[in-house]
A protein has these predicted regions:
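Phosphate-binding/switch loop-helix module in NTP-utilizing enzymes
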Residues: 84-152
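Loop/turn-to-beta-strand initiation segments
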Residues: 46, 74, 125-128, 159-167
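Phosphate-binding/switch region of NTP-binding enzymes
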Residues: 166-207
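Short, well-ordered beta-strand core segments
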Residues: 19, 47, 164, 188-190
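Conserved nucleotide-binding/hydrolysis micro-motifs of P-loop NTPases
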Residues: 53-57, 82-85, 135-136, 170-174, ...
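Substrate-engagement module of ASCE P-loop NTPases
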Residues: 136, 148-172
């Protein structure tokens, strides 16, 4: 089970759950998703961030502010930004690179590599995954292409018994696009300047 912490009244989500974190620009949705990852790190869980808008160094810097012992955190970042900016980089234990936010095939491969490493080499049972952001994917590809990719990606999260947190800018897309993508997720966290509301799947106590 995945504990969401006191901000969510200590609600828990079943392994394999995918949640859409939706809100307008500057509403704090990215930070909320990072905080949910950090809450898992505090309990010894793994964290994987697929970033299509910020470099891995920025993600790491922001994440380190949210955890008490950054050196002990098991985190992996799939960076789809740095190579796209023309910089020459190689994969490390912490960061793997895709060519651009359009390179969804490589994005999926690198993500799967991290899941395999976390499970087999580090012995991590629980993994929280953050994708930031679906809106960037939609800047480079049409909604049908993104839907197909995310259908596969969310299935991988489900098969890995991980928890998926997928960030999107709600005001950047029309209702049809939002409704199409929402079909892929088990729950939604709507973030606004005033806070957030969550529609999450209930968990059977027998689980």
């Amino acid at each position: 089970m995945y504990d969401l912490g006191p901000d969510f009244d200590d609600a828990t989500l079943a392994p394999g759950t995918n949640v859409l974190v939706s809100g307008p620009p500057l509403s704090g949705k990215r930070r909320l998703a990072l905080e949910l990852l950090a809450h898992g790190s505090a309990q010894g869980e793994g964290a994987i961030v697929v970033t299509t808008r910020d470099s891995a160094s920025r993600v790491l810097a922001d994440y380190e502010h949210l955890v008490t012992d950054p050196e002990s955190v098991d985190i992996g970042i799939v960076d789809c930004v740095t190579k796209h900016q023309g910089r020459s980089v190689r994969d490390t234990d912490v960061v793997k690179y895709a060519a651009s936010p359009e390179d969804m095939t490589r994005m999926g491969i690198k993500f799967s590599e991290f899941v395999e490493e976390f499970r087999r080499q580090r012995g991590l049972e629980n993994i929280r995954v953050m994708v930031d952001s679906l809106s960037t994917l939609l800047m480079y590809s049409d909604v049908q292409t993104v839907f197909r990719f995310m259908h596969v990606f969310t299935s991988r999260i489900e098969n890995a018994d991980a928890l998926g947190l997928h960030v999107i800018e709600s005001t950047a897309h029309d209702d049809e696009t939002m409704n199409t993508l929402k079909q892929l997720f088990d729950g939604v966290i709507d973030v606004s300047d005033d806070g957030f509301s969550a529609t999450l799947p209930s968990v059977d106590p027998a689980d």
